Amino acid sequence: MTSACLVDRLEHWWEAHQARVAPVTTLVLHLDNGPESHSHRTQFMARLVAFVQRARVSVRLAYDPPYHSTDNPIERCGGILETHWNGALLDALEAVCGFTAAMTWKDGHPLVEVVTTTYATGVTLTKEARAAVEARVARLPSLDKWCVDIPYAPGDLWDA
C-alpha cells in the first residue's frame, strides 16, 4: 500500500462521513509509523497538506512508538481474519471479499471495498516542494516524529 493510497482512502472516508462529522475541526489519525505513513515521507505529507486544505479540517498525526506486531490493532484484525477463513482456498476476489465482509471484529463487520487504482511507487518531491510542505507542518519539539499537526489555513491556495 502506498502513501497515496492511504490518503485516497482517507479522502474517500471523509467524503462519505463529512455530513455526520461536520462540527469536527481536527481529525486525529492514529498511525503506526510504518514506512508508508511516516511523518517524514514527503509524498504522504504533501497529500495530507492538500487534503487539509480541500477538506477544511486540521489533521493531527499521532504515532505509536515501535512495538511488537501482536500489539498492532490492524495486525490483530488480520489474525482474526486468518482464523475466520480457516485455511479456505482464496482463489477468487469474491472469496476474499466474502470472507472479509463476514468476519467479526470488535462486535462488527468490516466495510469491504475493492480498490483497483494502480499507484506509482518512488514518487518524490523537489527540494522546494518539500520545504513548502514542511512549512505547513507543526512538529512538537520533543515529539518531532510522534506528534505532527497540519493546521487548516483559511484562504491558503495550497496545491500539491
Regions found by a protein language model. Give the residues of each.
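Alpha-helical scaffold elements adjacent to nucleotide-binding pockets in ATP/GTP-utilizing enzyme cores
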Residues: 9, 43-48, 76-81
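Short, conserved, surface-exposed binding loops centered on an aromatic residue
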Residues: 18-23, 51-55
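Extended hydrophobic secondary-structure segments that form protein cores and membrane-embedded regions
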Residues: 26-33, 61-67, 99-100
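RNase H-like two-metal-ion nuclease catalytic core shared by retroviral integrases
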Residues: 61-83
